[in-house]
UniProtKB/Swiss-Prot annotation:
Provenance organism: Schizosaccharomyces pombe (strain 972 / ATCC 24843)
HAMAP family in the record: eIF3g (MF_03006)
Domain of life: Eukaryota
Key word Phosphoprotein present: yes
Cellular component terms (Gene Ontology): cytosol; eukaryotic 43S preinitiation complex; eukaryotic 48S preinitiation complex; eukaryotic translation initiation factor 3 complex; eukaryotic translation initiation factor 3 complex, eIF3e; eukaryotic translation initiation factor 3 complex, eIF3m
Location in or out of the cell: Cytoplasm
Protein name, per record: Eukaryotic translation initiation factor 3 subunit G
Phosphoprotein as UniProt keyword: yes
Record text on subunit structure and interactions: Component of the eukaryotic translation initiation factor 3 (eIF-3) complex. The eIF-3 complex appears to include tif32/eif3a, SPAC25G10.08/eif3b, tif33/eif3c, SPBC4C3.07/eif3f, tif35/eif3g and sum1/eif3i. This set of common subunits may also associate exclusively with either moe1/eif3d and int6/eif3e, or with SPAC821.05/eif3h and SPAC1751.03/eif3m. The eIF-3 complex may also include SPAC3A12.13c/eif3j.
Gene name of this polypeptide: tif35
Annotated positions of the Phosphoserine modification: S160, S164
UniProtKB keywords: Cytoplasm, Initiation factor, Phosphoprotein, Protein biosynthesis, RNA-binding
Homology family: Belongs to the eIF-3 subunit G family.
InterPro entries xrefs: eIF3_g, eIF3g_N, eIF3G_RRM, Nucleotide-bd_a/b_plait_sf, RBD_domain_sf, RRM_dom
Length: 282
């Protein structure tokens, strides 16, 4: 009389026949088809077919950035492959820092706002407090991120300098009032703006630029001759690509002359640059 051997729950099961190996085929359209057989959770043999398409994404970066990526790693990272290692480096989003001048909040305003918020909560009969800036469980006046998020429900104030001798320069709560908005000024908004001419004596007009030129590249090219005040690259509104010309303003005219003499006729991005001083407007 033959007796069957009882199986333990930890013993490997023998299915009798092995699974076929993974098969890979190249398709005419450039994709790959991968066929795999495996056992699912219910113990049944299933066939899995995958179609893989390889996509190459080309990113245009500055030459200096590409050279930095070729640097050899040192220290504890010495000998490892180039690029970002996900085990030691976390890549986050770029945080845009917004600096705003002329906005101040007095202690009296903070106390008034906190008292008003407490009164609203008490009137509703609830102890839930929510910040209007970051939506946290605290008063808006006590928000720790208030300096980062900025003022809530308040328009930005003019950042013009305040003169202590000017009568009417400070309004209620010590806030600055523009000259044309003061009582009895009799001036229209922006009348002095159009009468003031801009000094373009240190501004260069750069032409014959490629359509893929970026403002950072122009700034890196011209900053070696002196301090740059402003860089304007003309772009198409629909495509966002450069129109082929730009304006570079220096703080000093001597720096602009030096840049014009060195870069006029200079080969850059497979094109010959043309640099000349900007002509004043009529």
């Amino acid at each position: 009389m033959s007796s069957s051997k009882s199986l333990d729950w930890a013993d490997d099961e023998d299915y009798g026949t092995g699974l076929p190996s993974i098969q890979t085929f190249d398709n005419p359209d450039g994709t790959k088809t991968m066929i795999e057989f495996r056992i699912d959770d219910n113990g049944k043999k299933v066939k899995v077919t995958r179609v893989i398409r390889k996509t190459v994404i080309t990113e245009r970066v500055q030459h200096a950035v590409a050279e930095r990526k070729k640097w050899k790693k040192f220290g504890k990272e010495a000998g490892k492959n180039s690029g970002v290692d996900a085990r030691t480096t976390s890549v986050g989003e770029n945080v845009q820092l917004r600096l705003q001048l002329g906005w101040t909040t007095t202690k009296e305003e903070e106390q008034d706002e906190a008292a008003l918020a407490a009164a609203k909560v008490k009137a509703k009969g609830s102890s839930v407090v929510r910040c209007r800036a970051c939506k946290g469980n605290h008063f808006t006046a006590q928000c720790p991120y208030k300096s980062i998020i900025g003022p809530v429900d308040e328009p930005p104030l003019d950042a013009s300098p305040v003169s202590s001798r000017a009568s009417g320069a400070l309004g209620e709560k010590g806030r600055y009032i523009a000259p044309h908005l003061r009582a009895g000024s009799g001036r229209e908004s922006g009348d002095s703006m159009f009468k003031r001419e801009r000094d373009d004596s240190a501004t260069l007009r750069v032409t014959n630029l490629s359509d893929d030129t970026r403002e950072e590249e122009l700034r890196d090219l011209f900053r070696r001759f002196g301090g740059i005040q402003r860089v304007y690259l003309a772009k198409d509104k629909e495509t966002g690509r450069a129109k082929g010309f730009a304006f570079v303003s220096y703080y000093d005219r001597d720096c602009a002359i030096k840049a014009r003499d060195r870069l006029d006729g200079y080969g850059w991005n497979n094109l010959i640059l043309r640099c000349e001083f900007s002509k004043p407007r009529d």
